[in-house]
């Protein structure tokens, strides 16, 4: 299992329940959702605008509609809001004199996307801002609850990270398309990997 798949599955498996969103995080009822979490490299994991899935030919892109009222049901999502996960880079260090072990650090990005205006969910942009902030708070809670490491298993394949840190965030808005977004940096670390 690669690191991007690990983070996608970690978010899907550990997204908090609506009661945690309400009681612990204070998220308004309209924003207690589970967004679609996708690996940017896996073109067949996306959903077209009608919610269907399938293989995509080389050179083609999968279209994803944030206005789709019917959730594409990728990873048990309950809304068409989107978190795209991708790896920015990796760094290795060798902390021993004999170079017998390696520490690995992975820089990841979780790109949160939601839409405001032009959809049936709201009449103004406040809804989009509130939705984006709510998804960010839930993402932050999910990552911080796993900060001391976690093992993710898919079938017979498993991977353990020893530390997961939430980093900075930057806005990524597209006013012309009325898209709101945050790019959130996540660092995942593995220690003492035998060489």
Segments (PLM) and residue ranges:
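Hydrophobic beta-strand residues in large extracellular and virion-surface proteins
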Residues: 7-11, 83-85, 108-112, 139, ...
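Small/polar-rich, solvent-exposed N-terminal microdomains that initiate assembly or binding
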Residues: 1-99, 146-155
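Oligomerization/assembly interface segments of phage tail-like spikes and tubes
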Residues: 100-119, 177-191
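Acidic-leaning, charged glycine-interspersed low-complexity segments
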Residues: 130-193
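Short, solvent-exposed mixed-charge patches
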Residues: 1, 194-195
């Amino acid at each position: 299992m690669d690191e991007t798949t690990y983070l996608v599955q970690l978010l899907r498996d550990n997204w908090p329940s609506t009661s945690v969103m309400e009681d612990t995080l204070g998220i308004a009822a309209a924003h207690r959702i589970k967004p679609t979490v996708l690996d940017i490299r896996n073109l067949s994991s996306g959903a077209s605008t009608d919610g269907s899935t399938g293989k995509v030919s080389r050179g083609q892109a999968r279209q994803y509609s944030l206005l789709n009222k019917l959730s594409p049901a990728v990873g048990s999502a309950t809304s068409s809001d989107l978190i795209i996960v991708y790896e920015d880079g990796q760094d290795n260090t060798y902390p021993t004199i004999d170079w017998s072990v390696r520490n690995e650090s992975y820089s990841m990005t979780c790109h949160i996307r939601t839409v405001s205006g032009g959809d049936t969910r709201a009449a103004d942009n406040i809804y989009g801002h509130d939705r984006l902030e709510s998804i960010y708070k839930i993402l932050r809670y999910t990552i911080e609850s796993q900060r001391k490491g976690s093992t993710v298993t898919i079938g017979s394949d498993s991977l353990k990270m020893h530390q997961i840190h939430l980093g900075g965030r930057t806005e990524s808005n597209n006013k012309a398309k009325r898209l709101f977004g945050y790019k959130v940096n996540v660092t995942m670390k593995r220690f003492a990997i035998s060489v």
